[in-house]
Amino acid sequence: MLNILPFFLFFLPFLIGNNRICVAVKTGFVGRNGTQFVLNGEQVYLNGFNAYWMMTTAADTASKGRATVTTALRQASAVGMNVARIWGFNEGDYIPLQISPGSYSEDVFKGLDFVVYEAGRFNIKLIISLVNNFEDYGGRKKYVEWAGLDEPDEFYTNSAVKQFYKNHVKTVLTRKNTITGRMYKDDPTIFSWELINEPRCNDSTASNILQDWVKEMASYVKSIDSNHLLEIGLEGFYGESIPERTVYNPGGRVLTGTDFITNNQIPDIDFATIHIYPDSWLPLQSSRTGEQDTFVDRWIGAHIEDCDNIIKKPLLITEFGKSSKYPGFSLEKRNKFFQRVYDVIYDSARAGGSCTGGVFWQLTTNRTGLLGDGYEVFMQAGPNTTAQLIADQSSKLKNLKYPPLVTHSAE
C-alpha cells in the first residue's frame, strides 16, 4: 500500500530441498522453526500495525514529531500490539533519507534511530522496508532516474541501479544507532527486513526478472546480516508456476510479474507475506459485502494452504485495511472486516498453522494532515471500537497454549 504524497543470535540452518529451517537458540532475535516464528525458544504470534510515516515524523524535531511517534507506540503497546511495519527509505525530495546515491541526511537517519530505540522501549518489533515500488517516497523510479534511465523496470536489471540499492541496504543495516550505540543488524528490536514494498514489474519476462532480483538481493542482505529474518514485501499474487492458483487473484488474472510460490521458495526468504484490499482490488464489488467476504476467505485460505504444504514457511498478513473514501464505508463495516481477518489468523494459529499474525494499514494519532489516506485507525477507547477488536486479538494470540517446540522437517 501507499500511493500518497545485548543479545546474540545463533541459528542452526538446515537446507532441505528449497527450504531453510532455522532453529533459534535463546536470544532476543526472532527466528523461524518450520512454519512458526520463535522467540527465546517459544512460539510467537504477531498483532500489529503499519506506520510508514514514523521515520520522517521523528526527523522533524522542530515540532512534536517524536512525541507523535511515542504516542503511537504507547497506544499500540496498550492494546497488546507487538510489531510495526515502517519505511527505512525516502529518496529524493520531501524530507529525504537518501538525498542522492550514497548521500544521506543525518537528521532523518536520527529520526529512524529514535523510532528503533522507542519501539524497543515499548517491546514492539519492527519490520523495516528498504525501498518502495511506487513513486511515493522516491521508490524504484528515483533509483532509475539517478542512473540516467527512463524505464522503472530497469531497477531490477541495470547493474548500476542494483548497486545503488545494495549500497543503501548496507548503509541501513550497518547504521550505528546514535541513541543505543548498536548497529541495526545487531538490534533485536528489528523483527525483519523487507526487500521492497509491493514489487511489480511489467516486462514481458517479468516473472524471471523479479525471481532473479529477489535471489540476488536476499543473498546480499543475508551476507551482511544473519541475525534477522527477511521477507520480500509481496502482496500475494499468484504467477504461472502453478497456473490453477491464479483463480485466487483478483479477477483471476496473472498480475505484476510476481509469483507467490516461487518467490517465497527462495532459501534466503524466511517468511511469506500477503496484503488484502478488497475495496480497491474488487471495485465492482466494493459495495457488495458478501462477495468481498468470499474473496477474503478464499484469498487468505489459499495462501495459508500453500505456506502449510508447499512453501513451508510462516505467513504474515502485512497489510489489510478498509478505506473511508470508498462508497458505503462505515465503522461497523471496517470492524467486521478486521474481525474477519483476525478470526482467520486466530483459527490458523490455534491449529498450529502457518498464518502467524496480521499488520493492519495504518495507525495514526490524529485526524488531520497527509496521513489521512482513508485507512487510518485511531486508538479510541471504549466498546465496539476498532481499538477494542485489536486488543481482543492481541489477548487471544498471547493466551494461546502451545505444545512443546519441536524442530520441523521441510519434507
Curated annotation (Swiss-Prot):
Entry comment describing in which tissues the protein is expressed = Expressed in roots, stems and flowers.
Q: Which domain of life is it from?
A: Eukaryota
Q: Name one Pfam family in it.
A: Cellulase
Locations listed in the record: Secreted
Instruction: Tell me which positions the record assigns to the signal sequence.
Output: 1-17
**Reaction(s) catalyzed by this protein?**
Random hydrolysis of (1->4)-beta-D-mannosidic linkages in mannans, galactomannans and glucomannans
Q: Where does this protein hold substrate?
A: W87, N197, Y277, W361
> Which protein is depicted?
Mannan endo-1,4-beta-mannosidase 1
